[in-house]
Curated annotation (Swiss-Prot):
Keyword field contains Disulfide bond: yes
Region Important for interaction with CD80 and CD86: start-end pairs: 134-139
Protein name: Cytotoxic T-lymphocyte protein 4
All ranges on the Extracellular side of the membrane: 36-161
Signal peptide (residue range): 1-35
Length: 223
């Protein structure tokens, strides 16, 4: 019995010695989550184009060699955060938002250039960029201070069909006006020529020249 108790005591002593490397490894993996973070910078103000397109860079530092990055764009409304678009990518040049067709971007080292399309005036607000370095460990996360995006709706353009009808109406009006002016001018010209000719050709006999007067010579007799 004494030997059995001694063996159990030795096993209990050896169990912590075998598990402590795993505990240390997990500690090293999860300590950076709470102790280290990345700094994310983004412009403070961006004005969207007349087509509702806004682009802004999202840069994080310090730079870490990572194979998998997750970028999330959040919109802050009062005290609430709404996810606009998010993606996880591993390529070095393109950032694909498969579930968000109105978002696109490019990646270059530690800089992500984001583009949001289809914005309207009601979408004006503060947009925050969140960056997560997923793989390889350790895990890093950071969020920017936000970019205020201003969107101005363009003035509504007139209907193209309406403009086409206006152009056709003006063209027809000018055509009939020129036709009327030409008809009036031709009528006046014909009225001026009517007293001079009846418009019927009549063959006239040739006129004979007036005969010269013949004088009888007057002789004066001389005795």
């Amino acid at each position: 019995m004494a030997c059995l108790g001694l063996r159990r005591y030795k096993a209990q002593l050896q169990l912590p010695s075998r598990t402590w490397p795993f505990v240390a490894l997990l500690t090293l993996l999860f300590i950076p989550v709470f102790s280290e973070a990345i700094q994310v910078t983004q412009p403070s103000v961006v004005l969207a184009s007349s087509h509702g397109v806004a682009s802004f860079p999202c840069e994080y530092s310090p730079s870490h060699n990572t194979d998998e990055v997750r970028v999330t764009v959040l919109r802050q409304t009062n005290d609430q955060m709404t996810e606009v678009c998010a993606t996880t990518f591993t390529e070095k040049n393109t950032v694909g938002f498969l579930d968000y067709p109105f978002c696109s971007g490019t990646f270059n080292e530690s800089r992500v250039n984001l583009t949001i399309q289809g914005l309207r005036a009601v979408d004006t607000g503060l947009y925050l960029c969140k960056v997560e370095l997923m793989y390889p460990p350790p895990y890093f996360v950071g969020m920017g201070n936000g970019t205020q995006i201003y969107v101005i709706d363009p003035e509504p353009c007139p209907d193209s069909d309406f403009l086409l009808w206006i152009l056709v109406a003006v063209s027809l009006g000018l055509f009939f006006y020129s036709f009327l002016v030409s008809a009036v001018s031709l009528s006046k010209m014909l009225k001026k020529r009517s007293p001079l000719t009846t418009g019927v050709y009549v063959k006239m006999p040739p006129t004979e020249p007036e005969c010269e007067k013949q004088f009888q010579p007057y002789f004066i007799p001389i005795n």
